[in-house]
Amino acid sequence: MGKVVGIDLGTTNSVVAAIEGGQPSVIVNAEGLRTTPSIVAYTKKQELLVGQIAKRQAVINPENTFFSVKRFIGSKELEISADSKKLPYKVVKDQNGNIKINCSSLNKEFSPEEISAQVLRKLINDATSYLGQDVTQAVITVPAYFNDSQRQATMDAGKIAGVEVLRIINEPTAASLAYGLDKKQNETILVFDLGGGTFDVSILEVGDGIFEVLATAGDTNLGGDDFDKVLVRWLVKEFEDQEGIDLTQDIQALQRLTEAAEKAKMELSTVEKTTIHLPFITADKTGPKHIEKELTRKTFETLCQELIERCQIPVEKALTDARLEKSDINEVVLVGGSTRIPAIQNLVESLTNKKPNQSVNPDEVVAIGAAIQAGILAGEIKDVLLLDVTPLSLGVETLGGVMTKIIARNTTIPVKKSEMFSTAVENQTNVEIHVLQGERELVAGNKSLGNFRLDGIPAAERGVPQIEVTFDINVDGLLSVKAKELETGIEQSVTIQGASNLDESEVSDMLAEAEKYAALNKEKRQNIDLKNQAETLCFEAEKELDLFKTSIPEEKQQNVQKLIENIRQDTQTDNFESLKLLVEELKMAMKDMVEAKPFVDQTDTDPMSNLNDL
């Protein structure tokens, strides 16, 4: 079996970690960095870029640079807010209402799972290079408040990337593993996880190798991206008031504003004020226009006050669900880069009466926890038991459009529960089972996970047939549902996979497509290496010709020069098949040329050779 890694697939950045020498450690990527931007781009030449290299070219290629895609994974277009779709790239929907991301460079539409898969593939490839062994399996983290569709979609992204996802675990739970692995005494910890696009709060009992989640709450549409957007809107309005130009119509300007907003937000975590300087942001008939704006931490906090206040609700909800007072919390662990914002740290301290524990790196702790879970599954770490919970209630639609809950939120998983139902009308011979997830009383306010039908019910009076509906949630938090008519024993079951928006054939096609691009990239890299090798060889050959032109036969010199010309021509025209052959020919010609050089006796030229021994 290959190495199992832990992956934090983040909205803004992703991290991969593994167990080395019995300890979890973050794996450095190909660029030498510990975090990889969750960004995928396709250039005008249809070249795939992932990570830092994709981020660097975002300003000049905004329409084909895809970031914050995690916000769309496993969701329908109707479920996404209009604000979330205000991006430099186009977010559209297919005929089934599924989200698609338009790539004008390839004239193609991608699912969010495909884009996420490209990030996963890079992480896996970098881990393989770093560890020196194949990586084929992974534990991937998701926000605790991800629903069944989003979890299944994350599994699909893993499949498309060509990796077997052994386990999906919640990000705050992973963070608690990293924090509490060596804790012997029992502690109640609150994990406050504010990342780039999602927000989770989990309360856990940790100690003696047991990690039990007591409650979880969150908001999958709140994160650092939203703070950036507030700053972008502020900059756009200030510029329009001053210059009368609306920058929202210029996607390159918007991309520059977004990058500047993120940079300013990060700087304000350590300084009281910063200056946003964007020369040549646009131009009109009077000439070029620039932005130079001072932003204080106080102004930033005022602008983002609503977002900061939204962080309060899940904390209070988690405490209520866990039946705990703030005084019962022993430690508060901060996770996610956005927890570096001083106003967030102050909010957490006021809500819990505890100074947040900052002994863990908020950017890396989730991946470290995922690596620990990977180590547990691979047998590298023993005596650790993880008891997670389902974040949202699950149930079925019953008469009158009501949701009847079968598994309540914050139930420890894996779990299996059954409820008895009957028919609503006389002589009813089939029932439609509509599976739902959420906390609202009525069907309309909850997430529909899927439908299936149980046929063959014996005709009888209303309320007589007994239909047992069983919900089964596995360790990944994924659901399967079974309905059984007790008199006849007829049953029908379904694994809720349609919720992921992709069927098996689509996932297979996307995997093939991803592998094709991986092969193309490998070929492209080999061709670049061949060009570099050819140029180096030509340089060496020219040097040899220059050094020994008087002592090498003319026909051999002409042969080498002709080969150099042909190689440079093939390099210009990208004729790689011919180039490969010519490089080998030049190597042989150079060897032949060197062997044709007359031997020079070095002793004859030694100025000391005529001296007699003393």
Curated annotation (Swiss-Prot):
NCBIfam families xref list: PRK00290.1, PRK05183.1, prok_dnaK
PANTHER family: HEAT SHOCK PROTEIN 70KDA
InterPro entries (alphabetical): ATPase_NBD, Chaperone_DnaK, Heat_shock_70_CS, HSP70_peptide-bd_sf, Hsp_70_fam
Primary site of residence: plastid
Keywords, alphabetical: ATP-binding, Chaperone, Chloroplast, Nucleotide-binding, Plastid, Stress response
Pfam families: HSP70 (PF00012)
Main function: Acts as a chaperone.
GO molecular function terms listed in the Swiss-Prot or TrEMBL record: ATP binding; ATP-dependent protein folding chaperone; unfolded protein binding
Protein location: Plastid, Chloroplast
The organism's place on the tree of life at top rank: Eukaryota
Protein name from the UniProt record: Chaperone protein dnaK
Gene3D superfamilies assigned to the protein according to its UniProt record, in alphabetical order: 3.30.420.40, Actin, Chain A, domain 4, Substrate Binding Domain Of DNAk, Chain A, domain 1
Family assignment from sequence similarity: Belongs to the heat shock protein 70 family.
One of the record's GO cellular component terms: chloroplast
